[in-house]
Amino acid sequence: MSKSKSSRSTDIIDIYAKPDIKLKVLEPRQDRELRVELEGRSINHAIVNAVRRSVMLYVPIYGFHRSNIHIELNKFKNMYNFDLMYNIFETLPIFDVPNFMDLIDPDVYLPVELSKNLFGRFVQEQYTEQSDQEDKLVDATKKLFKIELTLNYKNNTADDKYISSHDCVIKIDGKTSDGYLKRRPICLFVLKPSEEISLRAEANLGIAKNFAAYEATTNAIHEEKNPNKYVITYKTLEQLNKYVILNKACTIIYKKLENLQDYLLRTYTEDRDPTEQIDIELYGEDHTLGTILENVLQQCEYVEKAGYCMPHLLIDKILVSYKLYDDSEIGPIKVLNDCITYLIKLYKQLADLVPKK
């Protein structure tokens, strides 16, 4: 350990110790709301913000993409155009999908491209038709839910008919779901007398980072009580249980970190000189990973300075840079690897603390 580091900084963390975390479920103020308090010496703004971002951006959800909405042309007799119909059904939620296991074994349950988006590819990839076809063949073997919505309606009355979610039939793995009927109807559009519509939509798995139709929650926020105590608040959109969402958000972060650790071990087979500044480019990543890596490196006893940047706002690529003290006892790649191990332990512990309800 560098003496200069210990004498100048009061926020050093021991990356070799067990993370100090407590999780407390608070009383919700609204229906479907989850409020959890995270507290402990290992909790700070970066750790909590990564959870918040993961809740909002990364939890996989089934939704209707317009490419999977099929309108029957000879029964589409109304005043609307196809684009409007696509927009309506893309934003229609799907309720009560028993999708609890997809992160346990991503190789079995997640499409290839989605798995890469979630858990990191870290290197720049080049799209080819061959790779796309290979991914489709692999995806065909995945254990995904088959979710299908149908709507067939002709207004045979003399009055306008408000078409709602109650007029839709949705099936999950061939079984009719009562997710729409047991909730208040969601108004979709109006059919005038003698107008009709017939369509079928198939759901696929996606994440909100790529398309907002796959949001699992309303806007997630965190509130600072003190530097080591925060409250995270969000409301589930009812496809997934509110506790399942939090567990998945933490699981995604630690699995992403595990993949990053594997990538570093493959890429850096030998350590570097402790006096050397290390710059690592990670493609496909954004502020979620960048902030927690920066934070843990800045609080590590061996690191003199550390930071990250996202060079382009519209391109997912981060550059992580750090330098050890010259008298450091271990190499920079080993330090980074140990810091990542600490973060993996932290988020695993956090996931285990989420109630199983």
From Swiss-Prot:
UniProt catalytic activity: RNA(n) + a ribonucleoside 5'-triphosphate = RNA(n+1) + diphosphate
Main location: virion
Class of enzymatic activity (EC top level): transferase
InterPro entries associated with the record: RBP11-like, RBP11-like_dimer, RNApol_insert_sf
SUPFAM superfamilies: Insert subdomain of RNA polymerase alpha subunit, RBP11-like subunits of RNA polymerase
EC number, UniProt record: 2.7.7.6
Gene Ontology terms: cellular component: DNA-directed RNA polymerase complex; virion component
One GO molecular-function entry: DNA-directed RNA polymerase activity
Assigned keywords, A-Z: DNA-directed RNA polymerase, Nucleotidyltransferase, Transcription, Transferase, Virion
An individual GO BP term: DNA-templated transcription
Subcellular location(s) of the protein: Virion
A Pfam family this chain is assigned to: RNA_pol_L_2
Assigned protein family: Belongs to the archaeal Rpo11/eukaryotic RPB11/RPC19 RNA polymerase subunit family.
Designated name of the protein: Putative DNA directed RNA polymerase subunit R470
